[in-house]
């Protein structure tokens, strides 16, 4: 009995810039033991494989950069990078779109093969440099304006709440007479 199976192939239409001209291309994503990417641009085919799709995309980009081809997808943007947990726990099809000074959140996740604007493209080196800078930069959580409470508001709220005398509460509780 043969238990082998053909890996499922997902095809995506993407754009590339080749020597300054935008061209259409097809990405094929395959996942079995490893993650493989095959890019067909005109009559040329480039392929790569790795433990996860982020690694395969990085290997593919190395080949493309040698041929002056820019793949226009989110995974090629300067401020897009996966967290170590994404790399360790899955196929790394998503990564965070990061902003210097801010913590990456779930709503910042993007599909790395979604299209990007040509102006957002960055080389692997530029992307790695941004990620290193993001890691070194102190970060804060962005709070939504409508529900954020300032420290002053929290202090005022604390002052207006009646304080219970817990000693008095427990003293009367033991006698069965509650006051609190």
Predicted features and spans:
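Polybasic, Ser/Thr-rich amphipathic helices
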Residues: 161-178
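Long, contiguous binding/interaction regions
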Residues: 2-10, 14-35, 46-50, 54, ...
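Secondary-structure transition/turn motif
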Residues: 39-44
């Amino acid at each position: 009995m043969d238990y082998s199976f053909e890996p499922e192939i997902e095809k995506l239409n993407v754009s590339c810039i080749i020597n300054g001209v935008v061209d259409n291309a097809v990405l094929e994503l395959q996942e079995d033991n490893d993650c493989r990417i095959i890019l067909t641009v005109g009559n040329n085919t480039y392929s790569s494989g790795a433990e996860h799709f982020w690694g395969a995309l990085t290997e593919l980009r190395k080949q493309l950069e040698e041929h002056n081809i820019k793949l226009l997808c989110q995974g090629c943007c300067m401020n897009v990078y996966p967290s170590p947990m994404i790399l360790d726990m899955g196929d790394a099809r998503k990564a965070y779109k990061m902003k210097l000074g801010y913590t990456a959140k779930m709503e910042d996740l993007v599909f790395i093969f979604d299209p990007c604007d040509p102006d957002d493209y960055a080389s692997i080196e530029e992307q790695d440099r941004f990620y290193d800078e993001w890691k070194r930069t102190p970060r804060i959580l962005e709070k939504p304006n409508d529900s954020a409470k300032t420290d002053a508001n929290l202090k005022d709220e604390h002052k207006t709440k009646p304080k219970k005398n817990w000693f008095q509460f427990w003293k009367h509780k033991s006698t069965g007479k509650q006051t609190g």
